[in-house]
């Protein structure tokens, strides 16, 4: 296994570049450098940036943490994509500046749905029964 590969054999470079792009975009949002009246009053989270293996396309996962819908935020960011790409080109040294695609981050909803399922009475009852069975089997040894 090479130094710059994950155990599955994938290159680490797309992960590293994606994280650098995420930092640049998050910093620009924090400083209010992205044009759009709606973004001035909102908190927007950039949770992840996934790069294609050739580093030419960056999929940016965003979540609006305030009043506007994710679609509104994605629309504003998409309109400013060329401005954002130029900023990335100035701050990160790459052969090609990746094309930015913005998608709503669904992981927050999925996490809360899983959490609510784990807290449901049926699951709690099953977990309690499993704990009781394990205690009984340990006591008989």
UniProtKB/Swiss-Prot annotation:
One Pfam entry name: RBFA
The principal localisation class reads cytoplasm
Say if the entry is tagged with keyword Lyase. Answer: no
- Could you list this entry's UniProt keywords, alphabetically sorted: Cytoplasm, Ribosome biogenesis
Stretches with biased composition (Acidic residues): 129-141
Write down the InterPro entries for this protein, in alphabetical order: KH_dom-like_a/b, RbfA, RbfA_dom_sf, Ribosome-bd_factorA_CS
Gene3D superfamilies the UniProt entry points to: 3.30.300.20
User: Where, subcellularly, is it found?
Assistant: Cytoplasm
Can you quote a single GO CC term?
cytosol
GO terms for molecular function, please? Answer: ribosomal small subunit binding
Region annotation Disordered: where it falls in the sequence:
120-141
Q: Name one GO biological process term.
A: maturation of SSU-rRNA
Record's function text:
One of several proteins that assist in the late maturation steps of the functional core of the 30S ribosomal subunit. Associates with free 30S ribosomal subunits (but not with 30S subunits that are part of 70S ribosomes or polysomes). Required for efficient processing of 16S rRNA. May interact with the 5'-terminal helix region of 16S rRNA.
User: Which PANTHER family did the record assign?
Assistant: RIBOSOME-BINDING FACTOR A, CHLOROPLASTIC-RELATED
For this chain, the family text in UniProt reads: Belongs to the RbfA family.
Q: How does it assemble?
A: Monomer. Binds 30S ribosomal subunits, but not 50S ribosomal subunits or 70S ribosomes.
Question: What is the protein name for this chain?
Answer: Ribosome-binding factor A
Q: Quick one: which gene encodes this?
A: rbfA
């Amino acid at each position: 296994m090479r130094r710059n590969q994950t155990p599955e054999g994938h290159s680490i470079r797309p992960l590293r570049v994606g994280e650098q792009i995420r930092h640049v975009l998050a910093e620009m949002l924090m400083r209010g450098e992205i044009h759009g009246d709606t973004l001035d009053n909102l908190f927007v989270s950039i949770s992840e940036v996934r790069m294609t293996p050739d580093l030419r396309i960056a999929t940016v996962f965003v979540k609006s943490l305030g009043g506007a819908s994710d679609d509104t935020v994605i629309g504003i960011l998409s309109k400013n994509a060329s401005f954002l790409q130029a900023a990335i080109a100035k701050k990160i040294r790459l052969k090609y500046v990746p094309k930015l695609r913005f998608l709503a981050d669904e992981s927050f909803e999925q996490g809360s749905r899983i959490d609510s399922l784990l807290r449901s009475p049926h699951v709690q009852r099953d977990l309690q029964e499993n704990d009781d069975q394990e205690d009984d089997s340990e006591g008989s040894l």
